[in-house]
Regions:
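N-terminal secretory signal peptides that target proteins for export/translocation
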Residues: 1-16
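N-terminal leader/targeting signatures
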Residues: 5, 17-18, 25, 281
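Bacterial N-terminal signal peptides
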Residues: 21-31
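Cleavable N-terminal signal peptides
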Residues: 26, 36-37
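Residue-level hotspots at or immediately adjacent to binding/recognition sites across diverse folds
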Residues: 37-481
Length: 481
């Protein structure tokens, strides 16, 4: 399928064959030239997928995933899109033999049909490059799959068929391959589901159970609305002092995560894993890998409103160590009290401000949040700057984002099902962004599930196949209120 350059479009699944192949049609707001495949039964229209997983690699390449087993990739900044979803014909199972080596076998569409690859809701996705990516399903059993060839083939690297398993977030460090998956408490054990990887998601193991993943109250769990309830704070890999060039390593992983509960809290947990050489009788060395252990576990109260369905839905970490969290209650999308919080210094979330009664709230429920790199004067000078607005809850309607920015500021953007907001002061004050036509002619749709920045663009995905990619130059010119 060949389509012209587009920024906003709806991906609609039109038909699914017996083997689960996806046929895609695109309905776009901008000019499109494509061959649309008709629905065989117009009386039963097939709804487009909802996208919640988003991984942006650069200004050209991004992966996103969602319901109906859908995985999409662009490698040219949105000019064209590849539908690379796992199917019964391109998916294999990965197994580990007693000697620790991994082997695979083909997926059987008959015996393995209960897995229903094409029905999974892939709520989070991580990609290392244009070829290598990992996807995570949420709800109704758990699957983690990996591709090494840009989605042509997939390998199932983790399964859990317990009815009460629900995975929420996936994070992997692109340099070391160390990562983690976080899930809701499992009824049979009452602990958070937690997995780790050290090989870029090719294999996964359970993290040790302890106080660190025991829910603080009866409501504490996490939300898979954007895959951003988990962040990697720091990773350190140190070689053994006596063996600088060998494989013996000490690996330290520090993560932060937050969700819902009676009183939502932010967890900072540090894990340590050691890899040692053990001497054998023939004077050779064996590689012994220990299970990660918890070195420290901090629990920090958050000024986010709690209760059923309420809490932190998304977080982001800036390059200077500031944390920003958004949330609310998805059943009450217009309720803004306690829907956002920010860390008060570059301390990775050791102290938080905001929440109930704080004037710098978002416009309601928000599930995704992201923060840009610093914006410098040369970018600002290319846009006219109206009179600077006053901070606080009452804001004029005739100003642009550019009027808020000083050289060196970062632009924080958050979005949800009922709108989007922006901040120039690391989440202290938020401004609503109405739907509007941008200076480039693009139309800003307004509401999404997840967002992420590349160096020159803001990317967003949402319900009903919604996607948008906006140049930061357009972002600076957007009207706010």
């Amino acid at each position: 399928m060949i389509i012209s350059y587009l920024q906003v479009f709806y991906l609609k699944i039109i038909n699914i064959s017996l083997k689960g192949f996806f046929y895609i049609a695109l309905t776009v707001f901008t000019t499109v030239s494509s061959n649309l495949i008709a629905n065989n039964d117009p009386s039963k229209p097939i709804k487009p997928p909802h996208y919640r997983g988003l991984c942006v690699l650069n200004d050209s390449c991004a992966w996103f995933s969602g319901s109906k087993g859908t995985v999409i990739r662009t490698t040219d900044g949105g000019k064209h899109f590849d539908t690379i979803s796992p199917q019964s014909t391109n998916t294999r199972f990965a197994y580990f033999l007693p000697d620790g080596k991994q082997t695979v076998e083909n997926y059987n569409p008959v015996s393995d049909a209960p897995i229903s690859l094409w029905r999974k809701d892939y709520r989070d996705i991580w990609a290392k490059n244009e070829k290598e990516a990992v996807i995570m399903s949420a709800g109704d059993s758990a699957l983690i799959l990996k591709t090494m060839d840009g989605g042509k083939n997939w390998t199932i690297v983790y399964t859990d068929f317990r009815k009460d398993i629900f995975l929420d977030a996936l994070e992997i460090d692109s340099k070391t391959g160390i990562g983690m998956v976080l899930g809701d408490p499992i009824n049979t054990r009452k602990h958070f589901a937690a997995l780790y990887t050290t090989d870029f998601g090719s294999s996964w193991n359970n993290l040790p159970i302890g106080d660190w993943n025991l829910p603080l109250d009866s409501l504490e769990s996490f939300f898979a609305a954007s895959g951003t309830s988990l962040v990697i704070i720091e990773i350190k890999v140190k070689a053994a002092d006596s063996c600088v060039n060998c494989l013996a390593r000490t690996k330290n992983l520090t993560v932060g995560f937050a969700g819902g509960g009676i009183n939502p809290s932010y967890h900072i947990v540090k894990f340590k894993q050691q890899t040692r050489h053990t001497k054998k009788q023939n004077k050779r060395f064996n590689l012994s890998i220990s299970q990660p252990r918890v070195v420290s576990n901090l629990i920090i109260p958050m000024p986010i409103a709690g209760g059923p369905g309420s809490g932190v839905y998304g977080m982001c970490l800036s390059d200077d160590g500031r944390m920003i969290a958004v949330g609310g209650n998805y059943t009450l999308p217009d309720s803004f009290n306690g829907a956002s919080a920010h860390s008060t210094a570059t301390n990775f979330g050791l102290k938080w401000s905001g929440g109930i009664g704080f004037q710098g709230h978002t416009g309601g429920y928000r599930s995704g949040v992201c923060i840009s790199r610093p914006i410098f004067s040369e970018q600002l000078q290319s846009h006219p700057t109206p009179a600077r607005v006053q901070t606080g809850i009452h804001k004029p309607n005739d100003t642009t984002i550019n009027s808020l920015i000083k050289s060196g500021n970062r632009i924080t953007f958050c979005t949800g099902t009922n709108g989007s907001d922006i901040s120039s002061d690391n989440g202290v004050t938020w401004y609503s962004i109405p739907k509007q036509t941008l200076t480039s002619g693009l139309y800003f749709e307004g509401s999404f599930n997840a967002c992420a920045y590349s160096s020159k663009h803001l990317w967003m995905v949402g319900n009903s196949g919604k996607f948008q990619r906006i140049p930061i130059s357009d972002l600076l010119s957007m009207r706010i209120k």
